[in-house]
Amino acid sequence: MNFSLSFFTFLFLAVSPLFLAQTTDESEIPFEEPITFSSTRIINGHSIASLPKGTYEMRIEHRFGDFSGTNGGYQNMFGFDYLSDMRIAIEYGVNDKFMLGFGRSKGTGAPYRSLLDGFLKYKVLEQKKGSMPLSMTVISGSSFTYMKNSILQSDVSFFPKASHRLAYFTQLNLAKHFGERFSLALIPTLLHRNYVTQNDQNTLFALGSAFRLKISSRFAILAEYYHVFHNKQFRPSSFYKNSLGLALEWFTFGHNFTVNFTNSGGLGETQFIPYTTENWLKGQFRFGFCVARKF
């Protein structure tokens, strides 16, 4: 999908609810305040939020190429000439505490393409004034690549067994809102890949953190950071980087739009946590967006 089609698809989806809103009484929109995180995702990773019982949500995510640096700049239209990754997913709230989702992403090709993913999410605690000081969810998911097997045995995409195509993650998402405008999250994550190269680790631990700052009734600023703890002898810091993202969120009843900048190319925990190699300080960050529609 080229830039023009991607951009105008996003523009159409973003503008359409404005026309619907003209016939809607703002006082009838059932917002609950305060909101810790308004979407089930922050930027790259999951948030504390889950879908209400019986609610479906379709998500479309795009991630373009480097804004500047060696692979960016005006010659590549600041990354818009490239589509780093794209993901389409459908999610469902089984009840008010439990949800699940399935998706398919293109993959960055570094190292994987053609990825299927799924997750389960359960709300253990919910922040309530006077009784519960924070919210907590448990999330577990996996991804499977069905890309063509490499003929080179030294490649990470050479899969001796079908199980080597799998990767898993489990995380505990802790979040707290401080009044109506500011929220913080802490996200310890354990990730395991069944097959890696000799200079990598199968199991990684990462500690994610994020905040949300509501700036109006419809807009919020988001930031997210994942620090990966690893053996630097096998995963040198000069090559692998930690994922950092900044975003502007626009939310309406039924829709959620996020425009973001991040140094991660891949979508999903099994991709952006272990395979981020771009450096913000070298201009190696890229524009992306997410459109989510509940129905």
Residue spans for each PLM region:
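A mid-sequence, solvent-exposed acidic-amphipathic segment
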Residues: R181-H230
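Cleavable N-terminal export/targeting peptides
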Residues: M1-P34
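Transmembrane beta-barrel domains of Gram-negative outer membranes and organellar outer membranes
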Residues: Q22-P160, R165-Q171, A175-L191, L213, ...
